[in-house]
Amino acid sequence: MTKNEYRLLTSRAVNKIGNVIYDYGNSSWIAGLGVVGQKYLGYYQLVDSLIALFLNPIGGAIADRYKRRQILLWTDAIGAIACGLLTFMPSKQGMLFGLITVNAILAISHAFSGTSFRAYVVTLVKEERLVDFNAHLEIISQIISISSPLLAFWVVDRLGLRPALLLDSISFALSFVCLWSITTKETHLQPKSGQIDIRHLLTDIKEGLDFIHREKEIFFLLTIATLVNFFIAAFNYLLPFSNQLFNRSSSYATMLSLGAVGAILGALFANKYFKNNYQSLLIALGISDLGLAMLTPLHLAKVSTLVLASGNLWFECFLTIFNIHFFSMVQKKVPKALLGRVFSSIFTLAVLLMPLATILMTALPMSVNPLSFSLIGFGISLTSLLAYIYARQHFM
């Protein structure tokens, strides 16, 4: 990899560390406030979803109109300053409202930085290296997802919330420094890029939607991602009930741990054994569902918890391969000037369908059942099969 690729990966890694530590430390601190904490933790989590829903489309338009590196620098700087100032909050009540406020600020920042980062990647990474870069990004993300909560627990438990916030501030500052050292010129900017108002933003968003509707391959990829996210949301709703469903106290933790291992394995295999084309993409998606389908018969066979959880390892492994090739294909097929808006559409639709899946799982009386894992797997399998038939007729 080039120096700029290393710097971009390092920036993303330390930025994610800051986000994970902030979310874990603050959620556990708020939850520890008792009845009051339960109410405010709901507010804390609701802020994320609402901001993502309303600001993702705007974030994509901004990412296409301005320099993406500057957007990332601004969001890192805001995160560093906000977390740093929060360490000086004197009272518990002030800290509580401060945490919710800063969480809203970070959620706003993420609405802009998430799409900007995915779109900025193509400025630094050559097309033939996109799959490899996205695989490295996934490996780093999974390692941080496993290790950062442990670090956050140690810091909050031993040192308290304020040192954790200071660590957050430092991580955002380090991410800023890594990005600052990248000087590659961005080529996606158009002559109109200096103008900005609500009308121009709405026009930009419409241009992005028109492009997605006009380009059948991009619309196809977006449809697949939306349907897959629906089933993943249903799976994520069901997963915390693993201990009760499988009558084992360690099922949930083991499923999560092996799922993370599967994601790392998927990132390692993505570029070695799968090509970046529709056939590989949809085969990986179709194979992934076997992991979920295995959970129900493995439970009935009364195998060990480790063997049972290997179904989630399989699922996450091939789902990660699908995700890596999906994002790489979008980055290759979409013009640089429109990447921000296309990615914002992907993220927005994902946010829209996740609550729908959760509502459906909540409303159905028998949804919390071991059989539901297999049904979700069947839904993913059917999606991949229909998508494969369509792609074979039109794109392959």
Feature map (PLM): residue ranges:
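Short amphipathic helix-loop junctions that connect adjacent transmembrane helices
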Residues: 25-39, 237-250
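Juxtamembrane intracellular "pre-TM" segments in multi-pass secondary transporters
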Residues: 1-5, 185-222
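Hydrophobic alpha-helical transmembrane segments
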Residues: 96-107, 132-189, 253, 257-258, ...
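A single, central transmembrane helix in multi-pass transporters
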Residues: 13, 161-163, 204-265
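Structural signal for membrane-spanning alpha-helices in multi-pass inner-membrane proteins
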Residues: 27, 83-90, 152, 156, ...
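Substrate-agnostic recognition of the 12-TM MFS/MFS-like secondary transporter fold
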Residues: 7-24, 44-61, 67-82, 98-157, ...
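MFS 12-TM fold signature
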Residues: 78-86, 106, 171-175, 287-295, ...
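C-terminal transmembrane bundle of multi-pass solute transporters/carriers
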Residues: 54-56, 65, 69-71, 75, ...
